Each structure stands twice: as structure tokens, then as C-alpha cells.
């Protein structure tokens, strides 16, 4: 999957709606942990950065949240980001499990999607279209990926090819649903007063 292009398209759709403070949230290892990012996460971060650069938006390192596999740590980092001076008006989650953590934190802080903040996530998990509002997602061509891998494997097993493995980049598709609005419509990631100091 062309993760760079997919992330770039998602962030460009947000900047096109006026968002200037966009956070990327991932469950990849954080700074200080083993600094190993799988290629798909690295490509998504690179696409995010390139889209901000193309929109002439300064890249703010604190808007890239690498929470590691500990969901409590990830949630704590998102909470801290939501009360920081550089609060996001939109989030890009690198997968649907990260989106679930984001949804929990935003609900806990009494923030509404898309009224207060916008959210786009990678992966068109079944639940993403079943919630209210349904999430805007980056759908990966799972069937096409499986077909391409199977065809390559069968050709190798039959001895039809001795060429080195090839890399095939398949496009992902941005499916716009109800979780994105213009930044001027929302107040951003500002907790309601009843939750401040709780």
C-alpha cells in the first residue's frame, strides 16, 4: 500500500478544510524506547510531514504522538496534547486501534467529533462505519493485496519466475464520512470546563 500517498491525501484534505494544527497519533514505539518503526508507520509519518510542508504549515514535533503499545500511555499522551497550548483541531490515527483510544479520550474530555475536533484513521474496520458519526477512513485494498501476494507466491512455487521479489504499491482510498469538519466550525481540542482539573 502506498502509505506515504494515503497519509498525504488525508492531511491535505484536512488542510483544505482550514486545519493548521493536525496531530498524528500512532502506537509505534516512542522516543526513548526501541526506536523501531515499521515501514508502514514511517511512510505514514513521512506523508503527514510532506503534506504539512506542502501546505506551508510548520511541523510541530509535539503533534506527532508515538505512544508505544501501552494504550494507557497513548491515552495519557493524547490527554496531555489536548490541554497543551498547541492543541490540535484534527487527528490522523495510524490505525483503527489508535482511533479507538482517541475516541475514548475525546469522549472522556466531552469533545465531539466533528464539532470540536476532526478525525481520520487508517483502516476501514467494520466498526468505523457503525458509530455516530461514522469515521472518515483510509481504506486499504486488502483484497488486491492478497491477490497480488498469492499470484506472486504461486508463480514462485511453480518456478515461473526467478526474478527477485517485486514491490507493488497499491493505492489506498480516502472514504469521507462524518468525522471531519472545517477547523473554523470546531473549538479544537479544548476540554469543556467541567472536565478541567478533574
From Swiss-Prot:
Coiled-coil portions: none
GO molecular function, one term: transcription cis-regulatory region binding
Pathway listed: Opine metabolism; mannopine biosynthesis [regulation]
Keyword Repressor: yes
Name of a matching Pfam family: Peripla_BP_3
Role of this protein: Possible repressor for genes for mannityl-opine utilization and / or plasmid conjugative transfer.
Gene that specifies this protein: opnR
Statement: the UniProt record of this protein carries the keyword DNA-binding: yes
Name the UniProt record assigns to this protein: Probable opine utilization operon repressor
Alphabetic keyword roster: DNA-binding, Plasmid, Repressor, Transcription, Transcription regulation
Matches recorded under CDD domains: PBP1_LacI_sugar_binding-like
Amino acid at each position: 500500500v502506498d502509505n506515504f500517498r494515503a497519509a498525504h491525501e488525508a492531511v491535505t484534505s484536512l488542510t483544505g478544510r482550514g486545519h493548521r494544527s493536525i496531530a498524528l497519533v500512532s502506537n509505534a514505539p516512542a522516543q526513548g524506547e526501541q526506536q523501531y518503526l515499521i515501514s508502514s508507520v514511517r511512510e505514514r509519518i513521512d506523508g503527514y510531514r510532506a503534506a504539512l510542508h506542502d501546505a506551508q504549515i510548520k511541523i510541530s514535533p509535539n503533534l506527532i504522538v508515538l505512544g508505544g503499545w501501552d494504550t494507557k500511555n497513548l491515552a495519557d499522551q493524547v490527554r496531555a496534547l489536548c490541554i497543551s497550548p498547541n492543541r490540535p483541531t484534527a487527528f490522523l490515527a495510524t490505525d483503527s486501534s489508535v482511533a479507538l483510544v482517541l475516541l475514548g479520550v475525546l469522549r472522556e474530555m466531552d469533545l465531539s467529533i466533528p464539532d470540536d475536533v476532526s478525525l481520520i484513521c487508517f483502516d476501514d474496520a467494520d466498526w468505523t462505519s457503525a458509530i455516530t458519526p461514522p469515521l472518515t477512513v483510509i481504506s486499504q485494498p486488502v483484497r488486491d493485496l492478497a491477490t497480488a501476494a498469492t499470484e506472486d507466491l504461486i508463480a514462485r512455487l511453480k518456478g515461473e519466475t526467478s526474478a527477485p521479489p517485486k514491490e507493488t504499491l497499491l493505492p489506498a482510498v480516502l472514504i469521507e464520512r462524518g468525522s471531519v469538519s472545517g477547523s473554523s466550525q470546531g473549538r479544537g481540542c479544548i476540554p469543556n470546563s467541567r472536565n478541567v482539573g478533574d
